[in-house]
Amino acid sequence: MQQAPQPYEFFSEENSPKWRGLLVPALRKVQEQVHPTLSANEESLYYIEELIFQLLNKLCMAQPRTVQDVEERVQKTFPHPIDKWAIADAQSAIEKRKRRNPLLLPVDKIHPSLKEVLGYKVDYHVSLYIVAVLEYISADILKLAGNYVFNIRHYEISQQDIKVSMCADKVLMDMFDQDDDIGLVSLCEDEPCSSGELNYYDLVRTEIAEERQYLRELNMIIKVFREAFLLDRKLFKPSEIEKIFSNISDIHELTVKLLGLIEDTVEMTDESSPHPLAGSCFEDLAEEQAFDPYETLSQDILAPEFNDHFSKLMARPAVALHFQSIADGFKEAVRYVLPRLMLVPVYHCWHYFELLKQLKACSEEQEDKECLNQAITALMNLQGSMDRIYKQHSPRRRPGDPVCLFYNRQLRSKHLAIKKMNEIQKNIDGWEGKDIGQCCNEFIMEGPLTRIGAKHERHIFLFDGLMISCKPNHGQTRLPGYSSAEYRLKEKFVMRKIQICDKEDACEYRHAFELVSKDENSVIFAAKSAEEKNNWMAALISLHYRSTLDRMLDSVLLKEENEQPLRLPSPDMYRFVVTDSEENIVFEDNLQSRSGIPIIKGGTVVKLIERLTYHMYADPNFVRTFLTTYRSFCKPQELLNLLIERFEIPEPEPTEADKLALEKGEQPISADLKRFRKEYVQPVQLRVLNVFRHWVEHHYYDFERDLELLERLESFISSVRGKAMKKWVESIAKIIKRKKQAQANGISHNITFESSPPPVEWHISRTGQFETFDLMTLHPIEIARQLTLLESDLYRKVQPSELVGSVWTKEDKEINSPNLLKMIRHTTNLTLWFEKCIVEAENFEERVAVLSRIVEILQVFQDLNNFNGVLEIVSAVNSVSVYRLDHTFEALQERKRRILDDAVELSQDHFKKYLVKLKSINPPCVPFFGIYLTNILKTEEGNSDFLKRKGKDLINFSKRRKVAEITGEIQQYQNQPYCLRTEPEMRRFFENLNPMGILSEKEFTDYLFNKSLEIEPRNCKQPPRFPRKSTFSLKSPGIRPNAGRHGSTSGTLRGHPTPLEREPYKISFSRIAETELESTVSAPTSPNTPSTPPVSASSDHSVFLDVDLNSSCGSNTIFAPVLLPHSKTFFSSCGSLHKLSEEPLIPPPLPPRKKFDHDALNSKGAVKSDDDPPAIPPRQPPPPKVKPRVPVLMGTFDGPVPSPPPPPPRDPLPDTPPPVPLRPPEHFINCPFNLQPPPLGHPHRDPDWLRDVSTCPNSPSTPPTTPSPRIPRSCHLLSSSHSSLAHLPAPPVPPRQNSSPLLPKLPPKTYKRELSHPPLYRLPLLENAETPQ
């Protein structure tokens, strides 16, 4: 006897590299073919590959040498009916006429490898046949798994989904000999528990899923069972068929209509609406009496005559033979499953009555409640008739009655299902083996049955995977030692391993059926009545043949689709029906949205409009992205023209039947024309209206800028006719009317907060004293609050269209980006103002107080989550004119220096800490806008506008999608306002800041730098003495709200920190520990954002700008560029500061309320008494006059503010600056950094050496040429600009304790650390960035 060949080990260590992954790419194509709207993960495809190789082993075990050998092996090993379908598919694959549709699995790769599996070379046609069988089975598995995934409302097929769906399919389980170990237990591991309470949206979403399932059941009745009756017109009379199926076609038509209405309503739901308004869908149909067919069907199906007629019909021998010839088990399915399936519409109608009540209870819209109430009223007569019919015929309707067990209608919560299974298992004594939940997904029914040959009655539990036979424990539960379980296990039957056979009544039993296992053992169970037997047989047969009937329905639907393709107009008449090709549209590889919709990579404008309004599916994300970004490749007028053209769909060319009807003067009503109108025209037109609605709702500024555009849209909307379109047209008209009113009346939505905003804080200046407003006279809390309110308003007004295409840097920026430019200009002005405030404070004591006050404002910014304000201060303190003020920084309190360190760290390492912080806070907040601008610039410049495909330019929509993602992130922080009170005078003060006055950018830059040299000359060991300009106290009011007036800090995210003078050591920002020191500078190659000021050059349109190592340039703003009216350039700076090692410095103690006096700087130990009068100002010429810092309304001057000066050098320079060289044009993406070598002669941290280093030009008027490296000192400060301090009327000077302790010799400047690495310079992010002449 010949020994059977050993199976080939595909995944052994030796063979795995040859086979693993060979089929995965092809299997993905098969999946896309059978379920184009779903995706499959890699793990699932590898699992199917394993199954396919397992199947290949089975086929090769017979040593096939011809196609007939393979066919015989398939017939012997494949379960029925899958063997017939697999053979038919394989035979068609080897026919010559099928060469136009080749197989997807790689035959050419598998054919040579089969020699290794079989041990001999096989003919190519045999390999082709085998591969065709394997492809059919893989498609069948993916089809089954996809249906399961679709039913559970997921969008990706996983390995677990394949296992679960195969577990429920007896045919595939038999084929692959799978273990029944996949059940609900494994599925419930990641599912959160549900409370069972459904809101309105959940109800509608669940109803859509149930209607789709219900529609499939109706298709099963009509297209599988009724078609089986219609196959033999001689055997079944039309009247007999009508008695069985009644008006099921009318029910099907109603269901299709209702499902379409609900889906359209969900798609067209306004974003401002709390939920879809489904009431109108039911109201319209109820008023048309469209639900009346349910009454007729109930009357026919529930009548006793139905069962009598059906039983007589099925008793005919010819009828039994007819159904048996269609498919194995089909006769039993007709006899037992069809009558129960016909009851589904009856019970589904009652489901509608309950659903309407639930929707009404959950609805939040009064109009929707009215519609639902009208629908309930209109259906009251139908409900009464249904109840009357039901009571008249009174079928015993029990909770366990298997009305429809065909489809796996599981409990809505898997947790409830597993709970039910666990309860049953606990109630069975003697249970062994796997838990029920590990091998079953659904509980079907339970009840008593008699086991023929047994003494006692059995209680049966039926699941989709198991049938459990138990013996009741009669009276034993009360006895000690016995189990408390109600049942004792007798037998278990695995459903996929048994056959169900109907038994005719005999002397030994009646109402019986037989379970036959594979080993030919059989068990006969008998019911008490014919009705109970029918219930059990319906459940068992539906479970056993479910997969067969499923496949029959799928094949019918596929055949219909192939035989009746959707007729469309010719491309010459309607250009939106041109076939997809690489010349007009491309999709992202292996990428789909969560809803399974393919993601567009690029396409022509026509193809993008087609997909925007596609007839097969709606893509809300694509609509939002398109309307946000379309202006970069299409004008609004062009878009309107295209959408109107898309809406006006011509009829397809008439068929011969249509031509005959037209000749007779009749309207053509062919089936394919009706299908065209229903499946193409109506969906497309609804989606065009949906795009119009989104356009006017979210992008109305297009219509504000072009009134002709609005007039054309209104004219078109008013011309739209059709009942289905009516409510959508009315919706668009309402939105336009509302927008017009808001535009005319300035209507704004009133915002209500849970708590009232905190009162306004005042310091020295009070309301009505506008002319005295200043950094030092206003309360630091209120300065931060009012600036936060102003910047929040500016941030929230920026529209996505102002960013797409970098339009804020283009010629028409004033028109296209007005709100963005306002924010940029405000940020620039505020940064310059902070810098000016510091530099113009000549008196050392005043200057330290000003810097300290700015740090307090920074703390409040942090508490308010105003990151834009934080980085404005960082930018100001790191400006060239402020950064060099070493003595000022050294006199700052240690705690405040640490606060500044933390703030500077936000901008380091690609803003890593800032991004983490932003994600960790709750709105409201004001994000740093510069990071978005840089990311958009990088995306715009780093990706081409068009994709080249076969010589054609396709719009690169992937690029637009990336930009839209950035704008979407901006928008998510625009919704939450601050609970703060606007103070009108302070608001006007900050809105009209004009620190530059009438000076040009160059003049203002020189002025600030010269002033900086004047107040702290180069190499000075102590600052010069200047008289105080202010007559008021420099003591800070602190940043704790006034507890005397209000004890809470409502209105801010959290209470402000206590005043720094009184609080213990505390840092507002969570920081990296000081022990974490960086030994090297991180040099990011592409910063994420226009950061705060780097040492950068300028360009008209740059965010990060370049600096030539030999040029002199400065920067004072963190934002991208605005062209300035008084100068060519706009400077953007970002201090990329890095923490170096430092020695701890304990500063000399500074008692509260004590101020530095300039006399104290010249003598050791000299202390000035409190009674000493203030120093007399020196008789010397006043500083250069600057325009007063009294705010001036912008008036007609709304241009950007000139840019700041170039940064000062760290080394002495010649008296005259060298000419500034022009930079060659550079691209802003991936520019390498220029690393300047560290200055020579920095051997150690010697204080005298530090003092000897020249920190300013030899001449005050000499601008520096080498930018100073930004080294983090122990206080990283941000440059600010400030006006002259306001002079209030001088009150009598009280005795002041002005005796500043004599300053000892300055300790080593640990705040200015040595460079252990080259300093960092940033390059331009835009092309053609030039250094100013």
Curated annotation (Swiss-Prot):
Residues 1019-1061, 1077-1099, 1141-1333 are annotated as: Disordered. Promotes the exchange of Ras-bound GDP by GTP. It comes from the Eukaryota. Residues 1174-1185, 1201-1223, 1260-1270 have a biased composition (Pro residues). Residues 1079-1099, 1276-1288 have a biased composition (Low complexity). It holds the Pfam family RhoGEF. Residues 779-1018 form the Ras-GEF domain. This is Son of sevenless homolog 2. Residues 1154-1171 have a biased composition (Basic and acidic residues). CDD domains: HFD_SOS1_rpt1 (cd22914), HFD_SOS1_rpt2 (cd22915), PH_SOS (cd01261), RasGEF (cd00155), REM (cd06224), RhoGEF (cd00160). One of its GO terms (biological process) is regulation of T cell proliferation. Residues 596-740 form the N-terminal Ras-GEF domain. Keywords: Guanine-nucleotide releasing factor, Methylation. Residues 199-389 form the DH domain. PROSITE patterns: DH_2, PH_DOMAIN, RASGEF, RASGEF_CAT, RASGEF_NTER. Expressed in most embryonic and adult tissues. The modification Asymmetric dimethylarginine is found at R1322. Residues 443-546 form the PH domain. GO terms for molecular function: guanyl-nucleotide exchange factor activity; protein heterodimerization activity.
